[in-house]
């Protein structure tokens, strides 16, 4: 898809002359707004785009029937990117959720998808309990799940990609009393949603405000939960402005697409160093106490206790795990390195005890690491994994 073929008819006025911006066709865009009265099911209204007579870059988003809101949308060319500004004004107190979809024109099956820090290709390397194509080929997520509030769709057939990115200062957030279904927010949030959907075989960018998650929400690691849709109050006479930026380009492959998206995200969001009250040296000193408090030295293989740890008590457990969650050998290497740097003989001594105990007692009869040992329950897990074995070898070498 080429946005220059997608968006037709908009002229951006600069000085006396008008310069043609990214072309726009309402047929490729669909928008809707859902309104909710607390205690009742929401009502969804489709929005038709009607171009304003005196401004060819602005549209009135007309609902399918009368609602107590006025919604307008303005498009502006920003150095070859299309910036969309949506303005919502309440004629009376309303709880709302606004959404918009952009059809890329790409065949959904030809596409790979990217959401920074959360979604790569089709996420098929993730467990089925995490968001992936194992569950659905369409996903909407909260923007704060991502390293940047952006979704990208890359067509391997067309060698082209399209992204949508939210532009905001993200100053507000509010807790909700429920985690699923239609929920009423108790205050203002800056968090919207972004994602992709398969609409009749066509890959579609979806975005809106406030947040939605569908077809599942992801409440914690490896835990999918029912979908959620948030509604924020807009009081009579109040207005809210929402801004997204569309960007498209031709590119050779998906890896180059990811690189381009990261560079674009950094340039757009300009992340700054966060000033903290504690120095890195102080935090390392505090965190190194884990190597002291968690050390277990009365078992055939010594280890740092962390697996199945109860955070309320931080009591030591009986599970010695080489890699992954337990990270016993890598933690021993970290403790050894830090201990030598800081001349902490206690850390160095315990680290060597762990290495020596594993070299003596940590291998199975077939020569692999005993990856997970449950000492009080008196059994060793027999299934081996590349990750734990490789982490153990890496730490020892």
Model-derived features with residue positions:
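Well-ordered alpha-helical scaffold segments within catalytic/enzyme domains
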Residues: 329-345, 391-397
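Bacterial N-terminal signal peptides that target proteins for export
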Residues: 1-6
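Low-complexity, Ser/Thr/Pro/Gly-enriched N-terminal "stalk/linker" regions
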Residues: 25-30, 37-40, 234, 238, ...
């Amino acid at each position: 898809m080429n946005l220059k073929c997608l968006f037709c008819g908009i002229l951006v006025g600069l000085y006396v002359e008008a310069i043609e911006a990214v072309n726009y066709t309402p047929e490729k865009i669909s928008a809707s707004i859902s309104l909710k009265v607390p205690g009742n099911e929401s009502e969804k209204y489709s929005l038709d785009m009607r171009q304003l007579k005196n401004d060819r870059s602005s549209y009135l988003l007309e609902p399918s029937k009368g609602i107590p809101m006025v919604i307008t949308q303005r498009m502006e060319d920003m150095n070859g990117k299309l910036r969309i500004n949506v303005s919502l004004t309440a004629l009376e107190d309303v709880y709302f959720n606004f959404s918009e979809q952009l059809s890329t024109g790409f065949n959904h099956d030809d596409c790979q998808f990217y959401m920074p820090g959360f979604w790569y290709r089709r996420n098929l390397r993730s467990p089925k309990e995490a968001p992936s194509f194992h569950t659905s080929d369409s996903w909407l997520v909260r923007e704060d799940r991502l390293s940047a509030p952006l979704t990208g769709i890359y067509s391997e057939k067309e060698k082209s990609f399209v992204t949508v990115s939210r532009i905001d200062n993200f100053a507000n957030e509010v807790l909700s009393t429920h985690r699923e279904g239609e929920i009423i927010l108790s205050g203002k949030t800056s968090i919207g949603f972004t994602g992709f959907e398969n609409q009749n075989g066509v890959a579609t960018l979806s975005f809106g405000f406030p947040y939605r998650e569908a077809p599942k929400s992801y409440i914690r690691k490896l835990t999918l939960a029912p979908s959620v849709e948030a509604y924020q109050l807009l009081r009579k006479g109040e207005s809210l402005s929402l801004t997204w930026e569309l960007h498209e380009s031709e590119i050779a492959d998906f890896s180059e697409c990811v690189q381009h998206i990261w560079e674009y995200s950094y340039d757009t969001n300009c992340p700054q160093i966060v000033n903290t009250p504690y120095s890195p040296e102080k935090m390392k000193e505090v965190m190194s106490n884990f190597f002291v408090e968690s050390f277990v030295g009365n078992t055939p293989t010594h280890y740092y206790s962390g697996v199945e740890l109860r955070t309320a008590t931080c009591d030591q457990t009986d599970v010695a795990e080489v890699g992954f969650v337990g990270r016993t050998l890598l933690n021993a290497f970290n403790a050894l390195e830090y201990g030598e740097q800081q001349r902490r003989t206690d850390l160095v001594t315990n680290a060597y005890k762990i290495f020596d105990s594993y070299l003596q007692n940590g291998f199975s009869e077939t020569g692999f690491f005993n990856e997970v040992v449950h000492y009080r329950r008196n059994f060793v897990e027999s299934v081996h994994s590349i990750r734990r074995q490789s982490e153990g070898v890496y730490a020892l070498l």
